[in-house]
Amino acid sequence: MIKIAHRGHSDKFGDNNMQSFLDAAQCGFNMIELDIQLSKSGEVIVYHDTYLDGKDITDYSLGQLLKRGIVTFEFVLFKIGPTNIPLFLDIKGDVKVVHEMVRLLKKYIKPHRMRRIYVSGFNRC
């Protein structure tokens, strides 16, 4: 049986935050699922919903999102990469996130010997 930490160890620490990801890596999960999308300024952030307080997530600057406890995908790769736990990335929102995701994965996969990254998403036409 494969144990996937949905949005990290979310039942213990909440969704898509660094503490839930690090705990999932240490608690015997086989994989971490997380949601990625773009901020207003084009950074890849880790957040599930497309709205935050009734506003589209892409209306928020990175600084505003960081103040709300939302982390960047790059920070997650930096911290989780050395654990070598596989990641399951769920792409949300604009497909432009794929280009930035690939750029960041190229930056972190080799140094951390990350072997398994799974990507899913859908785009309504």
Where in the sequence are the language-model features?
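Phosphate-group recognition and catalysis centered on beta-loop-alpha active-site segments
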Residues: 1-125
